[in-house]
Amino acid sequence: MGDYPALPVQLDSDRVIPFYSYLAKEFVFADHHFGSGSNSTPGHMLAIGGQMPTLKNPPFIGPHPVWDLPSIFTTADAGHVSWAAFPDQGGYPTKLYTSLTTTPGSANVFPPKDFIPMAKAGTLPEICYVWSPSGYDEHPPHVSDPTYITKGHDLVWERVQAVIDGGGWADTTFILTWDDWGGYADSVPTPVIETVPDALHPDGWVAIGGTRIPLIMFGGQVMQHIDSEWHSHASIPKTIMDLLGLPPMGVPRVDTAPTMAHHVDASLKRAAPPVPGSTIRQPTPPTPRPTPVAPAPWAGPLGQSLPPLVTRDGSVVPAPTDGLVRPKPPKPPVIR
């Protein structure tokens, strides 16, 4: 974390990530979605249960903390809705939740290799959270590898096709996003919703608001739309809850989050995307070119301190203050 200037970089999306580019143009692209102001683990946990007990990454190997927090999975259990989680090879990030590492919840946690066979067989439950395994998560490698984005992009494509092959396209709503921004400063400031003080920011830096993160929503019943509303990863479980009629989670950040459920229309029968490996013909640009729509102001309170966490067992988990502050920006990447 730190205060860095934005780095002007352009990416040829149609060439490098053609499947993502196609989905963003054909379905719902959220251009004002955001995560946390920190890194991977807070982002994942915000998307699972709307809370962040830490602002840094716990050890990926060896002993690690476990928290007894509500999540979309405990909420699904309360609503008698089936679910499954497919974390990476090491069980990250579901291994950070008590309810997902103990019975009965652990029985619904599968290794990444199981997703495609289950999808093709049509045996997936109603809710699935699916993470990319290590090596396919689109994180820049320590050693140069020009294929690192392609590998992750193509795995997502294959997984979507597996759902299609299993007959699930017509009634499946996909939400594709990333744990964090993964880059440098964003050129568009997000709302200052919740803050945490540190050595560089005695009045607080933006913990919720963070940086914008791409989010694409697609499926057989998902409309074509640019969603310019401000919403965070907490809107992911909120949207699932609204689509499936689940009870409140009991986490205010989730229960009051903006929903994206209105992008789903049961009367729609959208065509499935091209099959993996095919040459994608991108949609024809609209004429006239749409005018960008500014988002409405954030409807909730602003400038609030990050609150203590809601737990399942009634224990007290204070708001995290363990973020690592870096006064100097990292070395910019070499642009080729």
Residue ranges and their predicted role:
Residues 1-336:
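N-terminal pro-sequences and low-complexity stem/linker regions of secreted or lumenal proteins
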